[in-house]
Amino acid sequence: MITIRPATAADQDALGRFGGALMRQHHAADPLRFIQVEHPEAGYGRFLVSQLTNPSSVVLVADRSGEVVGYIWAAIEGISWKDLRGPCGYIHDIFVDEPVRGLGAGRALLREAIAWIRAHGRSQVVLWTKTRNDRAKNLFLGVGFRTTMTEMTLDVEPSPSVEIQKPRTAGSAGPGEGPADG
């Protein structure tokens, strides 16, 4: 039987292992888009444990007979001008260990995270998933998510001859244009 519970500091190794696996999975799917660092487990585990004391975040684990077999990390977020969305709950990570996929752990993690988000006053939940991750997309659609955005990525070679200048603010002077330059 799989139960969902809040993560604890004692889960750090399992969280790190699954976070590292998630990073490798994304990088393998598109190494130009997703980063890969050597031995991400320790850092990922520390980061997720740091979220346990953040009142705007929740990290839940799927526990099967005392063994952590998956996790979800969600947060409460405000308005995002960058993403053109209102306040929402955001599911940053969800991962279930391969041997237990299909046994309901992912669905149970999602339901508990969504309940936590609702209890924190948000009426919308947002997440991203890889374009080619059909299993995850089917899980999300089955829980009631709908597709709203598609990320597009273009890889370009930087041009060494182009210097990017920051835009000036009103009333600011550029080099050679200020009172000290006259």
Stretches with model-predicted labels:
Residues 46-60, 90:
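A short helix-loop-beta-strand connector motif used in the catalytic cores of GNAT acetyltransferases and
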Residues 61, 67-76, 90, 95:
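Conserved beta-strand in the GNAT
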Residues 127-136, 153-158:
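Conserved beta-strand-loop-alpha-helix junction that forms the acyl-donor binding cleft
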